[in-house]
Amino acid sequence: MKITLKRSVIGRPQHQVDTVKALGLKKIGDSREVQDSPAIRGMVNSVKHLLEVEA
């Protein structure tokens, strides 16, 4: 599963900033290939408004 940070974390609640960081994303446009697991899905779901997800 490929995730890309599409929106900034500036002004977001700290738990969302921490989740994006835990997913390995730092800057807008950063992409990362992650394993599709329930834990990762939950993290992605909590910040889905900031990410673009490709199967």
Curated annotation (Swiss-Prot):
Protein name: Large ribosomal subunit protein uL30
GO CC terms in record: cytosolic large ribosomal subunit
Subunit structure of this chain's protein: Part of the 50S ribosomal subunit.
Gene Ontology MF: a single term: structural constituent of ribosome
One of the protein's GO biological processes: translation
Keywords for this protein: Ribonucleoprotein, Ribosomal protein
InterPro entries membership: Ribo_uL30_ferredoxin-like_sf, Ribosomal_uL30_bac-type, Ribosomal_uL30_ferredoxin-like
